[in-house]
């Protein structure tokens, strides 16, 4: 993440000075433009983010991906066997937890299954969590998770996922969803998220680092499981 922000020029190796940003806005530039009256939406930190992004090559997320919605069957459809049903609580930027509920295979035979390179993005609850799938899946996600499919070759899926999980997008999600009592990020707002575009070679470099970090994380998980098994066997042997 540090390398991404550094390459985008949003941080550097020099000591940071405290920046005080003040804004004075007219009603025509606030409520009439955005429809928002909550003060949180107009915090100076968001103006600063906008000013920094304005200096970079960018595109709207909706220009880069095709956004697909999933289904929301309701808790009455939950069962212990069938197609795994992934909810936001099962999703994090490092992967998917094993879902605790399933859906009937016959009833939901035609429900969309996310495929390889699909980016899962949460829009409700813990908004803005992104994870890219490495393989095709036989699972269904809740309606609170969008399926993003990259349609422009100028952006790599791993790079885009990294940006989506970065403070650059987190702040945009925070601004958009902050006015709701229950956090909800509208798909129309998500499509307007500003994505900085780095040159292809730098995207490839960052993507390779992301892949390497996931591989190391998987290896660490295997070693941890083996260590736990050894401890359990040692305890059983001395019992």
Predicted region positions:
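Short hydrophobic-aromatic micro-motifs
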Residues: 85-87, 119-122
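A short glycine-rich beta-alpha junction/loop motif
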Residues: 139-146, 179-202
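Sequence-specific dsDNA recognition surfaces
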Residues: 59-74, 89-116
């Amino acid at each position: 993440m540090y390398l991404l922000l550094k390459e985008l020029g949003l941080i550097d190796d020099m000591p940071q000075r405290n920046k005080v940003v003040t804004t004075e806005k007219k009603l025509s530039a606030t409520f009439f433009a955005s429809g928002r009256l909550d003060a949180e939406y107009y915090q100076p930190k968001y103006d600063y983010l906008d000013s920094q992004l304005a200096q970079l090559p960018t595109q709207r997320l909706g220009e880069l991906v095709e956004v697909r919605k999933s289904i929301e069957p309701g808790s009455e459809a939950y069962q212990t066997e069938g197609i795994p049903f992934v909810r936001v609580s099962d999703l994090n930027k490092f992967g998917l937890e094993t879902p605790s509920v399933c859906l009937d295979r016959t009833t939901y035979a035609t429900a969309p299954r996310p495929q390889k390179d699909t980016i899962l993005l949460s829009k409700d609850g813990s908004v803005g969590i992104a994870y890219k799938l490495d393989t095709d899946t036989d699972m269904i996600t809740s309606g609170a998770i969008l399926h993003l499919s990259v349609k422009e070759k100028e952006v790599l899926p791993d790079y885009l996922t990294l940006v989506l999980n970065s403070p650059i997008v987190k702040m945009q999600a925070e601004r958009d969803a902050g006015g709701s009592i229950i956090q909800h990020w509208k798909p129309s707002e998500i499509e307007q998220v500003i994505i900085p575009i780095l040159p292809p070679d730098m995207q490839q470099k960052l993507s390779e680092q992301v892949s390497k970090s996931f591989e190391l994380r998987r290896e660490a998980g295997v070693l941890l499981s083996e260590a736990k098994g050894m401890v359990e066997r040692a305890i059983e042997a001395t019992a």
